[in-house]
Amino acid sequence: MSKKNPNLEDELSLFQDAVKGVKKFTHDTIITRRQQNSKVDKAKVSSKETQNHEFYFSDEFEPHLNEHGPTQYARTGVSKYEVKKLRRGIYVPDMYLDMHGMTQQEAKRELAAMLAACIKESVSCACVMHGIGKHILKKKAPLWLAQHPDVMAFHQAPLEFGGNGALLVLIDIPER
């Protein structure tokens, strides 16, 4: 036994009467698909970025750095006492760069930008925190820094500035 609501039938007939003369609407809007970046485009962008930063740092060049003991470097003509001041934490960094979680290309770009900012702002000491992790950036950061013409010296940072996971960098600021 089915019970039909007479109100439903009335409402349905009212609706059909209301839409009796309506014509079907034709759709004239064109839907365009978004172009997806292809892998080729991404490869071109990353190769351009690589070329821009190869000016500052090369992955093939490896300066002679002491493999035993803390990571340190002094450019020719820089006093060993300057390196000693870095080791003791006498130079306090005014600018910090944290490279945790960065790729090598990102780290190169940020390191170059930090050195340029240090020169622009006349900051003579900076701290580069490469972290310990898988030792990739820990090995690469000193090699890159030793190639930069404005880096006078660097030394593994004292514990208060990061210890094994950081370097204090002494930067040559040109006189204005």
Swiss-Prot record:
- Please state the Enzyme Commission number of this protein: 3.1.-.-
Report if keyword rRNA-binding is assigned: yes
Keyword Ribonucleoprotein among record annotations: no
- Gene Ontology molecular function, alphabetical: RNA endonuclease activity; rRNA binding
* One Pfam family here: Smr
Biological processes per GO annotation: rescue of stalled ribosome
Task: Cite the Gene3D superfamilies for this sequence.
Answer: 3.30.1370.110
The record's InterPro entries line, in alphabetical order, gives: Smr_dom, Smr_dom_sf, SmrB-like
Listed A to Z, the keywords are: Endonuclease, Hydrolase, Nuclease, RNA-binding, rRNA-binding
Q: Which residues form the Smr domain?
A: 97-172
- Reading the lineage from the top rank, the first entry is Bacteria
Q: Which cysteines are joined by disulfide bonds?
A: none
At the top of the EC hierarchy, this enzyme's class is hydrolase
Quaternary structure (record): Associates with collided ribosomes, but not with correctly translating polysomes.
Purpose: Acts as a ribosome collision sensor. Detects stalled/collided disomes (pairs of ribosomes where the leading ribosome is stalled and a second ribosome has collided with it) and endonucleolytically cleaves mRNA at the 5' boundary of the stalled ribosome. Stalled/collided disomes form a new interface (primarily via the 30S subunits) that binds SmrB. Cleaved mRNA becomes available for tmRNA ligation, leading to ribosomal subunit dissociation and rescue of stalled ribosomes.
> To which protein family does this belong?
Belongs to the SmrB family.
| Protein name per UniProt | Ribosome rescue factor SmrB
Recorded source organism is Photobacterium profundum (strain SS9)
Gene that produces this protein = smrB
